[in-house]
Structure formats: C-alpha cells, structure tokens
Design a protein with these regions (language model features):
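Single conserved hydrophobic/aromatic residue that forms the stacking wall/gate
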Residues: 1-5, 9
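Residue-level signal for inorganic ion chemistry
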Residues: 4, 62, 82
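A short linear hydrophobic-aromatic micro-motif
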Residues: 10-14
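Short acidic/glycine-enriched loop/turn segments that link adjacent beta-strands
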Residues: 19-21, 93
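Protein kinase-like catalytic core scaffold
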Residues: 21, 33-35, 83, 98
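Conserved catalytic cores of phosphodiester-cleaving nucleases, focusing on short active-site segments
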Residues: 23-46, 54, 62
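Mid-chain, well-packed structural core segment of small domains
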Residues: 46-75
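Domain-level recognition of nuclease-like catalytic cores that cleave nucleotide substrates
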Residues: 72-106
Length: 106
C-alpha cells in the first residue's frame, strides 16, 4: 500500500483476522467499491506465480472472512471485488507489483 495507491484507494483494514481466515488489505475505491486484496510474494525463479498460491481453499477462507467483515461493519450492501497483488523482488532491491483485479469472485 503505497502513497501512490492512496490517491485511488482508502485503506479500511490491514491484516484483518478472524478465526475463519485473514485478509491482507481491505480498501475502498472512490466509487465505494470495497476491495479485499490478498498479497502474495514469490521469488523471480519460483515455479509458480504468486496468484497460484491463492488456492480455491484460500479463496473460500477469504470469501468467508469478507462476508463476516461486511456483517460486522454493516456494509453488506456495498459493491465488492477480490484482488490479488503479486509481489516479486527485483535485483535492484525494488519490488514489482502486479494487481489482478477480480482475481476470483464470490
């Protein structure tokens, strides 16, 4: 979550955790859409992409946690989306971030 992203997103929660699961970032877009974002990091030489680590079982846990978040915050009527942020370290010491919007659905 960088300062550039703060122009687009407003952070609602970070590492939101319940017994059923955890959501790395919960953000709100200017249009009101809630974005539940799973952040995954892999080394450049990994045989799998970061997004591939978000298995169907992990997706179910995120979905259930998101449902409970919406209930607890009285926001069940809000539009929402589930994104994955793929983070890969570069040789320069910087990071490459690729956002997959709508990576999975409820």
């Amino acid at each position: 979550y960088s300062s550039a992203a703060s122009d687009v997103y407003k952070r609602q929660a970070h590492n939101y955790s319940l017994l059923v699961g955890e959501i790395d970032l919960i953000l709100r877009e200017p249009d009101g859409t809630l974005v539940f974002c799973e952040v995954k990091t892999r080394q450049p030489d990994s045989l799998t992409t970061p997004a591939e680590a978000v298995t169907p079982a992990k997706q179910r846990r995120i979905l259930r946690t998101a449902q409970l978040y919406l209930q607890h915050t009285n926001q069940s009527d809000q539009p929402m989306r589930f994104d994955v942020a793929e983070v890969t370290p570069l040789d320069s010491g910087r990071w490459m971030v690729h956002i997959i919007k709508g990576a999975f659905t409820a």
